[in-house]
Regions:
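Short carbohydrate-recognition loop motifs
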Residues: 23-39, 98
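Glycan-recognition/cleft segments
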Residues: 72-101
Length: 202
């Protein structure tokens, strides 16, 4: 695949990360290591993810080397103290996945934890999907065989009035994804099955 260069970093040509803010990110071979609450990346445009009731999918490829006492947020709202302004997925201290969705913007209208832990030291593909009927979080270690970790029934419309941030929620203090690495070749946002930001592996 042909590659392009953005800010001195090579990306695959179908990757749209030109409108991306990288904050104190150490990037080697497209891998971002999260080592503090000041390390994160996000779409620069404030209106990148505004699905307004359409179907959507948010995906990451992540490897966790350990669990922490605080939640390791994979993505969520970047507004300080306002966790409810974007869909969020995190790794809890137990290693379980957690997902939340808010319509009122002040609390989680729907939230649930998985019964299974995610595997450590293994690259995991994780995607959060809304199909207008259910919110589903799936996990795969090979991008082929998927397991449902979380399923939430509900057709509420997510608040989505902040900016989506990956690698934790740096502006909220301790909710960041320390002990994790993200592969930028599979970080993406889709709305109505169209890729609107990032890159999705085939």
């Amino acid at each position: 695949m042909k590659k392009i260069v953005v800010n001195g970093i090579d990306f695959f040509k179908n990757q749209d990360l030109s409108n991306t803010t990288f904050k104190k990110c150490n990037i080697i071979d497209n891998i971002v290591e999260i080592n503090s609450n000041e390390t994160y990346f996000q779409p620069t445009k404030e209106d990148t993810f505004r699905p307004e009731g359409n179907t959507w999918e948010i995906g990451v490829k992540v490897k966790a080397s350990g669990f922490t006492s605080n939640s390791q947020v994979l993505f969520g709202s970047n507004t300080a103290g306002k966790f409810y302004l974007m869909p969020s997925v995190e790794i809890q201290s137990t290693g379980a996945l957690w997902a939340g969705i808010s319509q009122n913007g002040t609390s989680w209208d729907l939230s649930i934890s998985s019964e299974k832990q995610i595997p450590l030291n293994v690259w995991c593909y994780i995607k959060y999907i809304y199909d207008k009927t259910n919110y589903t979080v799936l996990l795969s270690t090979d991008n082929l065989n998927w397991e449902t970790y979380i399923s939430l029934e509900g057709s509420i419309i997510a608040n989505c009035t902040s900016n989506l941030e990956f690698g934790g929620i740096a502006l909220s203090g301790n909710h960041y994804a320390i002990n994790t690495k993200f592969d930028l070749n599979n970080i993406y946002i889709k709305v109505n099955d169209s890729l609107i930001w990032g890159n999705k592996e085939d």
